[in-house]
UniProtKB/Swiss-Prot annotation:
Gene3D superfamilies membership: 3.10.20.30, Nucleotide-binding domain of ferredoxin-NADP reductase (FNR) module, Translation factors
Induction of expression: By propane and acetone.
Domain 2Fe-2S ferredoxin-type: 5-94
Gene inactivation effect: Cells lacking this gene are unable to grow on propane and to catalyze the oxidation of phenol to yield hydroquinone.
Reported function: Reductase component of the propane 2-monooxygenase multicomponent enzyme system which is involved in the degradation of propane via the O2-dependent hydroxylation of propane. Reductase catalyzes the transfer of electrons from NADH or NADPH to monooxygenase.
Name of this chain's protein: Propane 2-monooxygenase, reductase component
Cofactor(s) needed for function: FAD; [2Fe-2S] cluster
Positions bound to [2Fe-2S] cluster: C39, C44, C46, C78
CDD domains: fer2, monooxygenase_like
One Pfam family cited in the UniProt record for this chain: NAD_binding_1
Highest rank taxon of the organism: Bacteria
Length: 346
């Protein structure tokens, strides 16, 4: 059995134990403590600060924590192993979420439907079998296990807690992706898929009132659609401006539902941002040619007075992070998911 150590978190006065064979983040999940996190792969800069203790970090992106930050004492808890008792300062946390998040659990589901949305994005709908329903928040994600293997991939939920027994995921088919071939040929209705989760902090915060600027691209539509569905269902009174980046009009989807959801939100706008061509643009939709982050920059002069949510391929996420920094958006007003895929792994 691995040695265990005590971890103390400041300024929230929470303590827990961690084994030397698990990351601090995984130990927190195991004990019902929901620390701020995103990708869980050391790529998305959810940093904390070491006040005292002996730790080591596994492989991580220097974009998330550069050498100077690491030397100063910053750590990524998803990659950090403790080898002594430690005191850690949490730099970005939600007190309501810390001890009140949805429990991490193993879930058994069966495929209910597989439906193409665009030439390279598929809707995968799953019926929850065990337990009978799952608890999660709009904007979170699950790990899906490749049937018959221990391999897994993270996908955001497009549905809301209003349907805890039916989950929908929007999955982009990358060449060489483990799920890509299965979605095209190999996965069938009724087949069992194991899940684990929910994870992620790209969720709406209780009591927050700032306008929401949502920036999406590709399968990053999923968590933003979940947020829109939730706002529409609950009547939450917050302005929402949704910018979706795609290459051409053929890459746009769910436009009718987005329009319907928007009608139920007091102050809502949707802009399709097409980087390659605006030919054959759909009627009744605001379409602008160009990169989505450039278009947001041109249209959101007061971005720092909004809460920014984004989920997209890694290059678009990096561009959105740079945009938020350029506009001096406070870190606690930025929420995002940054998943990797075979197309972007280095």
């Amino acid at each position: 059995m691995a040695d265990t150590h005590k971890i103390s978190f400041e300024p929230v006065d929470i303590e827990m134990e961690v084994g030397e064979d698990e990351t601090i983040l995984d130990a927190a999940f195991r004990q019902g403590i929901h620390l701020m996190h995103g990708c869980r792969e050391g790529r998305c800069s959810c940093k904390s600060y070491m006040l005292e203790g002996d730790v080591q970090m596994d492989d991580y992106s220097t974009f998330a924590c550069n050498d100077a930050e690491e030397a100063e004492g910053y750590v990524l808890l998803c990659r950090t192993y403790a080898y002594s008792d430690c005191e850690i300062e949490l730099l970005n946390f939600d007190e309501d979420e810390l001890l009140g998040g949805a429990p991490i659990q193993d879930v058994t589901t069966k495929v209910a439907a597989i439906e193409p949305m665009t030439p390279d994005i598929v809707s995968l709908k799953l019926d929850v079998v065990e337990p009978e329903s799952v608890e999660f928040k709009s904007g979170q994600y699950f790990d899906l296990f490749i049937p018959g293997t221990e391999d897994k991939r993270s996908f955001s939920i497009a549905t809301t807690p209003a349907t805890p027994d039916r989950l929908e995921f929007l999955i982009k088919k990358y060449p060489g992706g483990l799920f890509a071939g299965m979605l095209t040929d190999g996965l069938s209705v009724g087949q069992e898929i194991k899940l684990n989760g929910p994870y992620g902090s790209c969720t709406l915060r209780n009591g927050h009132v700032l306008p929401i600027v949502a920036i999406g691209g590709g399968a990053g539509m999923a968590p933003l659609l979940s947020l829109l569905r939730h706002i529409s269902e609950t009547g939450l009174n917050r302005p929402v401006r949704f910018y979706y980046g795609a290459r051409t009009a053929a890459d746009l989807f769910l436009l009718d539902e987005i329009a319907t959801l928007g009608e139920k939100i007091d102050d809502f706008s949707f802009t399709a941002c097409l980087s390659e061509s605006t030919d054959n643009a759909p009627e009744g939709v605001t379409v602008i040619g160009g990169n989505v982050t450039d278009i947001v920059n041109d249209n959101e002069a007061d971005l720092a007075r909004t809460e920014v949510y984004f989920c997209a391929p890694p290059p678009m996420v990096d561009a959105a992070l740079a945009l938020a920094e350029q506009h001096s958006v406070p870190h606690d007003q930025i929420f995002y998911d940054k998943f990797t895929s075979p197309a972007f792994d280095s």
